[in-house]
């Protein structure tokens, strides 16, 4: 079976392969730091060998709970924010029919998301949609006090109990939370919810392969064994025994750091398949939270091509030359569709008649890459044989491992996120949360 692969040929005109190869000692040292747990954030390295440590029994437990939700729910709401929902959503959206919502007959419960914003309109419309429906909730929160998720869960818990009764609600509400402490744990134990544990040594943005991601993905009807198998394969490929030049995570980390040193401060993750939109969003958090600190870090941006070629294409082609692109390139689509012939040919597209739509998309991808390289934008390609659970597992672990290496190359702690607390403190002060009286006075004086 083929694996995903990284092609950096279109970086050669900007950074030589010899320069990238010279990173080998530094990358090796970073990988040893990860393996030995001697670097910054070493208490959050549970993701490193997670794929190979996941047992068949654990997956069976997750699938059994997922089946309960599938059997009893028309809709399942995944409540979480950031790493507590983006990974699951990335996989689910990548594997789902683009028009799943519109299908008259569903293959399982509709999966919707909450707790990732504080929009009154969104939550009102969600609760209205859930009215009179049999719905369940997967509440994903280590603490149970993250404002966005806790607020959404408070609304959903009440509605679920009101519509289904407390006994059925107990059956269809599942908590993914801390093993022992926190408001979500206390509530789950009190109400008798089924629970799964978020490991203490796995941070949110690295948690896709824990119950945080695996349970919602299983509820959506996708094969979590294959997902883990793909990640397990990439754990080996990206491991310390693989030579530098054959290790895609090592080469990716080295290349992006050299480009950063060369003044390329923005990385744009590109896809040519709209199903990968939320994979882009997951990647943005993974790298943004991991590297954006101490006044350093590549800014992670993302685009959906060819759509965004008609909005961001001009800037990428001719704007400030501080960018590079990484393209997720899918070799084989799931479906086959040919361009028909038209007798009038008013649109002038008969030269495409008989060709697959994917061939047109592939030429758009190739043409874009060449144009951007000519315009001064280095390009890397992550080549993926097809979109399925196995290869998504490979993609997830590849990006996670490269992120750990890249953060250490940059000289930061890739496993903390102190900056995200600043807005919370201000918000709590403005809301007059108990314990924030002094902060409230100080912030009111600034308004």
Swiss-Prot record:
UniProt keyword Cytoplasm, yes or no: yes
Family matches, as SUPFAM superfamilies: SIS domain (SSF53697)
Catalytic reaction list: alpha-D-glucose 6-phosphate = beta-D-fructose 6-phosphate
Known pathway: Carbohydrate biosynthesis; gluconeogenesis; Carbohydrate degradation; glycolysis; D-glyceraldehyde 3-phosphate and glycerone phosphate from D-glucose: step 2/4
GO annotation, cellular component aspect: cytosol
Protein localization: Cytoplasm
A Pfam family hit: PGI
GO process terms (BP): gluconeogenesis; glucose 6-phosphate metabolic process; glycolytic process
Superkingdom of the source species: Bacteria
Keyword Hydrolase: no
Keywords, in A-Z order: Cytoplasm, Gluconeogenesis, Glycolysis, Isomerase
Function: Catalyzes the reversible isomerization of glucose-6-phosphate to fructose-6-phosphate.
Protein name (Swiss-Prot/TrEMBL): Glucose-6-phosphate isomerase
Underlying gene: pgi
